[in-house]
Amino acid sequence: MNQRVIISTHLENELVSALSECEHDKLFVLTDTTTQEMCLPVLQKFYCMKEAKVITIPASDSHKDIESLMMVWKGLQEGGASRHSCMINLGGGMVTDLGGFAASTFKRGINFINIPTTLLAMVDASVGGKTGINFGGLKNEVGVFNDSKFVILDTEFLKTLDAENICSGYAEMLKHGLISTEAMWEELVSFDLANPDLKQLQRMVGDSVKVKERIVEQDPHEKSIRKALNLGHTFGHAFESWALKRKPILHGYAVAFGLIPELYLSVAKTGFPTEKMRQTVTFIKENYGTLNITCDDYDELIELMHHDKKNQNGIINFTMMGAIGDIRINQTASTEEIKEALDFFREG
């Protein structure tokens, strides 16, 4: 992995240091309409940011599209960006994904730094080099692998988040626990997410990022073990795309919902312990509620799964678990088994 991840203790000093290693003729900051208001003022106090040009795009994942991408390209072009410029992506996963893609493609690539401001972006989107946009009703359909030069994690930004966004990011942490150790999983399913202890959460963020870093370093382009990070995402991306046409849900909620049928399949096909599955499902249902799908939605959801980037030769590809930390990549399931898992999701 070519990016450096910094757990911030003094954001200004760390940003100055990062910028000194990213030589640039012009500096840009990408925000969305939410982080422009909530987070940008923190950076604008820093002397190193006094010349930075701000580009702002509409907030929410529904704007993670070609139109917003073109807005960023236009902002860079009109701001006089060259191949030697640098862009800071200040925001959640939508900003770091789209901003990373914009920076990777503008003039064949300029340097960029991610400063994630949501829990989801801290533990998932900003680390690992995946960039991209949604296209044709499908999640992250167009993009490239390209590392930011730095990721600066300042957990003070967690104080700007509402409960729903904390829950969204926490779903990826729960996934990291499942693919890591019993001790990490146990702490995660025991955590009081309704009344979070912020200091404990900040420590857990560091642990979660280390899980992803360790996996990405082994497999930067998702040829093998990095597929572990797709746990919950085959069903999850289908749920998210399905919801986009009705009532959109946050990515982390889709992943949490996706863990339920995928752990069900893990019990049925790879021997995951039923009790661990039940504990995880109970935690998810208590903290995330449910998604109101019916049997009539099954064919659409399965069709969406067939469009998943993880598939090979038209076969839906799953990551399953044999136990906590026992990862089984490149697993398959029949249409009948997928429908049984959806039945379990609905009826539990």
Residue ranges and their predicted role:
Residues L76-L90, D97-N114:
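Non-catalytic interfacial helical region
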Residues M173, T274-G348:
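C-terminal charged capping/lid subdomain of soluble metabolic enzymes
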Residues F101-L193:
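A glycine/threonine-rich phosphate-anchoring loop and its flanking beta-alpha core
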Residues E78-A81, D147-F150, E156-A163, A171-A183, ...:
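Generic secondary-structure signature for well-ordered alpha-helical cores
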Residues M94-F101, M122, A238:
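Short glycine/serine/threonine-rich phosphate/pyrophosphate-binding segments
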Residues M1-C86:
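ATP/NTP phosphate-donor binding region
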Residues S190-D299:
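Active-site segments that bind and position negatively charged phosphate/pyrophosphate groups
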